Amino acid sequence: MRRYLFSGDFGSLPEKDYDVVIIGSGIAGIYAALHIDPSLKVALVTKVDLTSGSSYYAQGGIAAVIAPTDNFDSHIEDTLTAGAGLCNEEAVRVLVEEGPENIGELCMLNVPFDTNPEGDLQITREGGHSCRRIVHCGGDATGRETTKRLGQIAQTKENIDIYFNTYLIDVLTNDGKVCGAVVCGETPEILRTPSVILATGGIGYLYKYTTNPKGAVGDGLACAVRAGAVSENMEMVQFHPTTLYAPTASDRLFLISEAVRGEGGILRNADGEAFMADKHKLKDLAPRDIVTRHILNELTRRGETNVYLDVSSMSEEFFSKRFPTIFEECRNAGINVPEKPIPVRPAQHYMMGGIKTDLNGMTNVEGLYSCGEAACTGIHGANRLASNSVLECLVFGRRAARHINAAGRTQLPLPEIEISSAAETVSSEEIAADNDKIRQTMADYANAVRRPSGLKKGLSIIRELKAKYDGIALTSKEAYEVCNMTVTAELVFEAAIARKESVGAHYIVED
């Protein structure tokens, strides 16, 4: 595996100095930036803008112990149960116990949470939770409203420079310690820094069908691994049970939030049978991996493309107010909800694994941090509990920032690096074809139901592509992304092959 993707004389690149460089502008990245000491200079780097990441599309809400009838032990137990025995219990306890305080901070920052007529936070229930503990914004627009508000605040901070339309190429190290990052907007440049936070999100765009936006290719993870960081639980890829099924759908599939089932939605097959009724004690609100597999079994058994989410128990007034985004999307697709059921099927949604970190977001590389979906604190184990993801962004984004504030690191000199560019290049058409090949390979062989022979075949295909991109000159964002995709995909296949038993989202059937 090549150490650096950039080819040429690093010393020829323009340089800027920062105390902290944060790659990624979802909730984890922005929230971390807002918690960096105002005396420290921060670069916040985003591939497109502050609303282009997965955070913006998060519908359900944020899980936290807010209700007087709820308690920490219950939330912890629900999280551990969903994680199927692979959670880091210490990390889970930190997540849960620091949750309410972070919700309080968001309230003070005027994030517009939905409230009841008495002015208290409105709380709903989602799959895997034993009680109502999900706070939300705009009905089903929690990610959008939270990201927008945090982004507005970040743009007013004098110590934060935001790099729009800029992507990460390399994390630089000197003697195993972070000393900068190579990024590229119009042209490549070096951001010198002793501390880098990777908040680059998930790997959804490695799959043909996903709820993630196009930029979610695992590039932060790949850069971290090339810099010497360790990955963990890479086989644990979550597939959301319910995305809107439309034959003409775009690459990013529209999510039908878990909260719809929390408010009474029932999964049915084409004959109207509520097939989850006898499959799990929580029925339609069972953990996501379980619901996903039962939907796939139903589709295979019946030879059909989708099942249906029956929402007829809700009035049109309630549904349109509680789920305005879903209501509008369904109506635009010609589905007369809530009278008519919503056609749904599973799609890739979330990465439980990622860059291994401690409870302060620190990796094994000094000065390199990660938080949010890009990181693996061990919270989610083998299967993430609904609405714990945004909570993780908050709790560990803040923890990473506070650790950096206290560390007082000084800038190291940049290493003297000059990498001769390979003579061979590939055309943009070939890069696009290889991108498609990776996504199809992941969909075929690293999906929700896996076979040993398929995993080996998929790994062989990915390794062939990886060797190809390790030996050519990379001259475009698209080429860098495909190279990173091969690194991340290889990690998924290797981890899936290494884990012989089925657990949580990693489900193996014999050939």
Positions of predicted regions on the chain:
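Glycine- and aromatic-enriched mobile tails/lids
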Residues: 1-11, 15-19, 27, 35, ...
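Core beta-strand elements of the Rossmann-like FAD/NAD(P) dinucleotide-binding domain
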Residues: 16-18, 186-195, 364-365
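N-terminal Rossmann-like FAD-binding beta1-loop-alpha1 element of flavoenzymes
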Residues: 20-44
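Glycine-rich active-site loop/strand segments that organize a redox cofactor
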Residues: 64-95
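Short beta-strand to alpha-helix junction loop
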Residues: 87-100, 134-152, 163, 211-218, ...
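Conserved redox-cofactor binding core of oxidoreductases
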Residues: 108-187, 199, 243-247
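Glycine-rich loop(s) and the adjacent beta-strand/alpha-helix scaffold that form part
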Residues: 195-250, 254, 301, 388-396
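An anion/pyrophosphate-binding glycine-rich loop and adjacent beta-alpha core
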Residues: 223, 229-340, 403-410
